[in-house]
Amino acid sequence: MPKPLVDFGNKPMILHQIEALKGAGVTEVVLAINHQQPEVMLNFVKEYEKKLEIKITFSQETEPLGTAGPLALARDKLVDESGQPFFVLNSDVICEYPLLEMIEFHKTNRAEASIMVTEVDDPSKYGVVVTEEGTARVESFVEKPKHFVGNKINAGIYLLSPSVLDRIELRRTSIEKEIFPKIASEKKLYAMVLPGFWMDIGQPKDYITGQRMYLNSLREKTPQELATGDNIIGNVLVHESAVIGEGCLIGPDVVIGPGCVIDSGVRLFGCTVMRGVWIKEHACISNSIVGWDSTVGRWARVFNITVLGKDVNVADAEVYNSGVVIEEQGL
C-alpha cells in the first residue's frame, strides 16, 4: 500500500490534503511519484476525481530528484497563463490546512515563496527557520542548532510563485537546502506560523500522536463526528458500519474503521483499527496500529507502538509489544 493511501482518521492520508486544496479553490492536483503507479493508486484517483470534481494527475520520476527536482519535472502542469502561485505539500503532514489564509499571507507580503512553519518546544532536533525580528521574512535556516536561535520549524507546506521554477534544474535538488536559502538571501521568502496542531505522521509513534491531535481538533470543530456512549472514553471516531459488542471499553484516542467487528469485552485505547479488522473477545490493543483485514484473537495483547500490516492473524492470548511490524502472515 503506498504510504499516501494509508488510512488516517478513516480516510487515506492524502485525501485530507486533497479535500483541503479543493476547499481553497484548487482545481487540479499533481501527485509526484517515484515508482510505477500501483493499481490501488489509479483506483484512488479515478474514485476521488469523480467524488470531489477535481482533476488529479501524476508526475513520475525515472530517477531520484530530491524535493525540488519533481517540481521542475512537473513544470508544464504547474504553470499556466494566469501566473497564479501553486501549493506544494509533504504527503505525511497532518494539520488543519489553513490554505486560504496562506494565499492571503502570500499576497500581502508579495512573496516569491511562502512556507508554513510550526512552533515546537524542542527545536534542537529539527531545522529551524529564522525570521527577521518583528516580521515574517525568512533570514536563514539553521540545521539542528546547538544553541537556541528560534523555535519555528518547516511544516512541509509551501505556496510558490511560478518564478521559483526558474531556479530549479531537472536534477536531484533539495528545495529546503538549495532553493529556499537563495530566495531568502534575496528577501523574497516568508514564513507563516501555522495555527493549531501539526504532525509529520510518517512514523508509527508520530502517527499515533498525530491521531490524538486530529481527534482533539475534531472535538473542538466538529464534535458531532465523534462517538458517544457509556462504553466510550474521550475522543473516539467510529465508522458507521463498524460493530461493537457488549462490555467493551473504547478510548481515549481511538479510530475504528469501516466493516470492523469488535467483540464483547474488548479494550482499545490510543490505537487505530483499520478497515475490515476483527478483534475477538477480551483482546486489548493500546498505542498501536492494526492494519486492514487483520484478526486479533481472544485475550490477545497488542501494545507499545506495535504495527500490524494487512491480513495479520494474532493467535488467542498472544502478546505483541514494542514496534513489531508484520505484514500478511500469521503470528
From Swiss-Prot:
The record's keywords, sorted A to Z, are:
GTP-binding, Nucleotide-binding, Nucleotidyltransferase, Transferase
Q: Name one GO cellular component term.
A: cytoplasm
Catalysis: reaction(s): alpha-D-mannose 1-phosphate + GTP + H(+) = GDP-alpha-D-mannose + diphosphate
Q: Which GO terms describe its biological process?
A: GDP-mannose biosynthetic process
Report the coiled-coil segments.
Answer: none
**UniProt keyword Metal-binding present:** no
Specify which residues bind diphosphate according to the UniProt entry for this protein. 3
Q: Tell me the enzyme class.
A: transferase
Q: Which CDD domains match?
A: M1P_guanylylT_B_like_N
In which pathway does this enzyme or protein participate? Nucleotide-sugar biosynthesis; GDP-alpha-D-mannose biosynthesis; GDP-alpha-D-mannose from alpha-D-mannose 1-phosphate (GTP route): step 1/1
Q: What does the entry list as the binding residues for GDP-alpha-D-mannose?
A: 66, 90, 92, 127, 154
| InterPro entries from the UniProt entry | GMPPB_C, GMPPB_N, Mannose-1P_guanyltransferase, NTP_transferase_dom, Nucleotide-diphossugar_trans
EC annotation from Swiss-Prot or TrEMBL: 2.7.7.13
* Stored Gene3D superfamilies: Hexapeptide repeat proteins, Spore Coat Polysaccharide Biosynthesis Protein SpsA, Chain A
GO molecular function terms noted in the UniProt entry:
GTP binding; mannose-1-phosphate guanylyltransferase (GTP) activity
Pfam family, any one:
GMPPB_C
Record flagged with keyword Nucleotidyltransferase: yes
The record's family statement is:
Belongs to the transferase hexapeptide repeat family.
Its function, per the record, reads: Catalyzes a reaction of the Smirnoff-Wheeler pathway, the major route to ascorbate biosynthesis in plants.
Name it: Probable mannose-1-phosphate guanylyltransferase 3
**The organism's taxonomic lineage, starting at the top:** Eukaryota, Viridiplantae, Streptophyta, Embryophyta, Tracheophyta
